[in-house]
Amino acid sequence: MVSCGSDVAVPAASSTSIPASTTTEADVPLPTGVLFAVPTQNREDPAKGQFQVQLHNDTDGRYDLTAVQFRWAGYTTPVVERTAVIVGGQTVDLPVPFPGATCAGDGSIDTMPSLDDAAVVLRLVDGSEVEMSVVDQFHLARRLYLEDCERQMIDAQVGIEWVDLHEEDVEGRPVTAGSLRLTRRDGTGEVTVRSVSNTVPYEFVAVDTAVGGSVAVLPDGVEQVEVPVRFLESRCDPHALAEVKQPTKFIAQIVLGDGTEHPYIIYPERSYWNAMRATADEACVILGEVEFVGQS
């Protein structure tokens, strides 16, 4: 299972970033006349385990940087080498890996460290450092913290993972088959996976689950269960076949032993991704459902 804190290869600086819409709260005002940083996230960033620090230079100064780091009691990234020049009036996005949250207290917003103390530190070509304040304009820094603390809480109670993924023939075309495994850790009581979402290229099927039934149940006192699953081709249109940003982001709804329900992302191990995609694409071809641009 791939976690949000996994080590990932991070690409070079990008010039644009699409902020994640995470809340209906009023926008946070941006300061003027200073250097500051805004955490943002592109659509492909979650699967890469990263986010962007959007650097705003609202001064007359020029900064030639060689590295960047996001520092906060909630999480601190490694120092990442980045080469960029930021002149007055310019905004530049730099990707940094999300390291996983350092959860305070129960990991809720009530015990979350204050973002007033967060900073982005730039290392300049002369070896000096410049510290920028963080403005969580889109509440992304907060969301990453809260979601990861929720995930860590679930992981401490039960392991949830895809296992034994392999190609299988179903009605004359290849599909990916395997099992969903639940393994008890520190949690007590019954744990239920109520549902698992589809993604753009894949339709999730719980083989032995009746319509409207739960995908998997780990009864109280039982240490482990596995249920058979399949990933069928979902869409075969050009947009679906070109989907590379979040093709394996399967979102499960989990009910823990205390009765609380939580979303939980179950990524297959990255080593499975290419084979899963090749199987779904081949199924589209065999079924004659591939659509081409301009085809009516």
Regions found by a protein language model. Give the residues of each.
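Terminal connector regions
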Residues: 102-145, 236-272
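Surface-exposed interaction/gating patches
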Residues: 152-235
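Intrinsically disordered, low-complexity Pro/Gly/Ser/Thr-rich segments with frequent PxxP/GP/PP motifs
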Residues: 68-108, 199-239
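Acidic, serine/threonine- and proline-rich intrinsically disordered appendage/tail regions
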Residues: 9-10, 23-27, 41-47, 142-182, ...
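Short acidic, flexible loop segments centered on an aromatic residue
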Residues: 56-77, 185-205
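Bacterial signal peptide processing site
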Residues: 4-8
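Extracytoplasmic/luminal low-complexity segments enriched in Pro/Gly and acidic/polar residues
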Residues: 205-296
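N-terminal low-complexity, Pro/Thr/Ser-rich intrinsically disordered segments
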Residues: 10-37
